[in-house]
C-alpha cells in the first residue's frame, strides 16, 4: 500500500511530503468545485487530465526561463514539486470579457479587452476570495512591492506564451488564474509560479465555434467537461485518445 504523510488538502489537489527535503508530491483529485466549493461533484478522470495539461504547460514555461515549482510528473495523477511558501493571492489575467469581470462592469461576454488586465484576489474561501488592490497587499503584508512587481512581470510573460500556445491549436485564452510562491534556496529567495494551469483554472474557447473547453461547463451545468478537457489535451498533443484516465489514487493518511 502507498501510505505517506499528507501536508495539505485543497479543493482539487492534495500535497504529500516529498521524497527529499524541500519537495512535495502534488496529487490531482477528481473533485470539481465552483463558487468556492458551494457546488461540488466528483468527475472521474478530471485529475489525470489536469495533471497532464499542467505538466505540459509548466515544462514549456521552465524551458523559457520562467521559474516554477514543477520538477517532474511522477505518474498519471502526481507531480514532484518544490516546496514553496504560497503567497495568499490568486492572480487573474484577463484578455477577453467573461466571468466576474463581465458581470461586474456590465460588459458583453466575449468582448475583447483594450489590453490584458491583471487582477488580485485574496485567497480566503470564507470571504469568497475578495478582489484586492496592491495597496491592500502591501498594507496587510501579503507581499512587498518588489514581489508584486515580480509577479506582474511573470504574469505578462506567462500570458504572452499561453496565448500563443493555445492560439496555435485553435483555442483562445480568455482568462486564467495563477498562484505564486516564495522559493528559498540557501539564503536567497525568488518568486516562482506554483499550483497548476489547466482547464480548471483557465477559460478556453474554441476560436471558430466559441465552444467552452473549461470548467465553465461545470459551473453552468453544460455537461461534457471530460470531453472538453480531453479535446484540449488532444490538441496540445499530450494525450492519446485511447489512453486510460482513471487510475486509482493513493491511500490517505488521516
Swiss-Prot record:
A Pfam family this chain is assigned to: SAICAR_synt
Record's catalysed reaction(s): 5-amino-1-(5-phospho-D-ribosyl)imidazole-4-carboxylate + L-aspartate + ATP = (2S)-2-[5-amino-1-(5-phospho-beta-D-ribosyl)imidazole-4-carboxamido]succinate + ADP + phosphate + 2 H(+)
Gene Ontology biological process terms in this record: 'de novo' IMP biosynthetic process; cobalamin biosynthetic process
Pathway participation: Purine metabolism; IMP biosynthesis via de novo pathway; 5-amino-1-(5-phospho-D-ribosyl)imidazole-4-carboxamide from 5-amino-1-(5-phospho-D-ribosyl)imidazole-4-carboxylate: step 1/2
PROSITE patterns linked: SAICAR_SYNTHETASE_1
Keywords, sorted A to Z: ATP-binding, Ligase, Nucleotide-binding, Purine biosynthesis
Single GO term (MF): ATP binding
InterPro entries named among the record's database cross-references: SAICAR_synt/ADE2_N, SAICAR_synt_PurC, SAICAR_synth, SAICAR_synthetase, SAICAR_synthetase_CS
EC number, UniProt record: 6.3.2.6
First-level EC class: ligase
This protein's GO CC annotations: cytosol
Family classification: Belongs to the SAICAR synthetase family.
HAMAP family the UniProt entry points to: SAICAR_synth
Protein name: Phosphoribosylaminoimidazole-succinocarboxamide synthase
Organism listed in the record: Bartonella tribocorum (strain CIP 105476 / IBS 506)
Encoding gene, per UniProt annotation: purC
